[in-house]
């Protein structure tokens, strides 16, 4: 099966919690993985630097990210801007998805629907 890639502009959430251990730099690449032991959110997906959590994927799209990773996809995060106020302190980024063609298409459609629904609710 062919592999594809896609990008999704978003943010790393929770920087206000991790600012003492992480100073984001534009262009920095971070790992993204399911956070299996998060007692507050069973769909939590963490953003990590050197295996240390420095933030999270926004809750609105975390379920979609988790499904993608569970089905063999890979996600990386690239910092694109300086931190800003949003839902706490957020760091602008692009999430890079890599996986099977069919799954990439489905995930991008889900992300588009999820973020469109958020804008109108």
Regions found by a protein language model. Give the residues of each.
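Conserved active-site motif detector
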Residues: 1-121
């Amino acid at each position: 099966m062919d592999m594809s890639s896609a990008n999704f502009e978003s943010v790393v959430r929770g920087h206000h919690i991790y600012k003492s251990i992480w100073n984001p730099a534009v262009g920095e690449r971070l790992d993204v993985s399911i956070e299996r032991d998060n007692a507050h959110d069973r769909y939590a997906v963490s953003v990590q630097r050197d295996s240390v959590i420095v933030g999270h994927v926004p809750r609105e799209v975390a379920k979609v990210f988790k499904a993608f990773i569970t089905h063999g996809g890979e996600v990386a995060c690239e910092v694109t801007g300086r931190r800003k106020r949003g839902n706490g302190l957020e760091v602008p980024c692009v999430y890079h998805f890599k996986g099977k063609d069919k799954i990439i298409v489905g995930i991008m459609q889900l992300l588009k629907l999820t973020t469109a629904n958020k804008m109108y609710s």
